[in-house]
Structure formats: C-alpha cells, structure tokens
C-alpha cells in the first residue's frame, strides 16, 4: 500500500466516523447536561405560554416537575408577567 492510499483511507474513515457521530452522537450521549436541558425546556414552554397568553398553564405545569427550580428567577419572571398583564389591562380600559 502506498503512502497516498494510506492517507486516503485515513481521510475516508475519519469522515465516516464524523457522520456517525452527527447522527448518533448526541442522541445516546452519556454526558448530557440534564439541568441545561430542563432549563431549555422550561424556557421553551414559557415562551409558548406567553405567545398564547396561557401564563396560568405555565404556572401550573412549568415548575411542577423541575428538580432544581431557581425560585428567585421564577419570582422575577412572575413579577414581569404581572407587570405586563397590568399594563395591558389598563390600556384596554
């Protein structure tokens, strides 16, 4: 086998490993940052709830299953939400 062929084989095997990682790498990863995933899910749910105006749904389901809820940030978000609601209700009168 010439050096040229060895280089080609290395290049193709590397490419196939990368494509395998692209399709399976994160799906079955053992080092998933669970807290980051939960936080991202909670943020996604909060955005959906705000967009649809269903903030009460977020209050009843959003934090119910969280293991490490940041109480301070939840209170802060609730205060913002209450402020927005009072602004919109006063402008509607």
Curated annotation (Swiss-Prot):
Segments of skewed composition (Low complexity):
38-60, 79-93
Marked site positions, Cleavage: 27-28, 64-65
Q: Where is this region: Disordered?
A: 1-93
Q: Where is the composition biased (Polar residues)?
A: 1-33
Give start and end residues of every sequence repeat: 18-52, 55-89
* Annotated keywords: Repeat, Sporulation
Record's keyword annotation contains DNA damage:
no
Glycoprotein as a keyword?
A: no
> InterPro entries given for it?
Spore_gamma
Tell me the GO BP annotations in alphabetical order. Answer: sporulation resulting in formation of a cellular spore
Domain of life, per the record? Bacteria
Annotated family? Belongs to the gamma-type SASP family.
What NCBIfam families does the database record attribute to this sequence? SASP_gamma
* Physiological role: SASP are proteins degraded in the first minutes of spore germination and provide amino acids for both new protein synthesis and metabolism. These proteins may be involved in dormant spore's high resistance to UV light.
What is this protein's record name?
Small, acid-soluble spore protein gamma-type
């Amino acid at each position: 086998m010439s050096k040229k062929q060895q280089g080609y084989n290395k290049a193709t095997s590397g490419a196939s490993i990368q494509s395998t990682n692209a399709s399976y790498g994160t799906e079955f990863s053992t080092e998933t940052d669970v807290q980051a995933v939960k936080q991202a899910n909670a943020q996604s749910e909060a955005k959906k709830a705000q967009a649809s105006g269903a903030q009460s749904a977020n209050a009843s389901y959003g934090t119910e299953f969280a293991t490490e809820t940041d109480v301070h940030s939840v209170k802060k978000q609730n205060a913002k939400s209450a402020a927005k609601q009072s602004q919109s209700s006063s402008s509607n009168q």
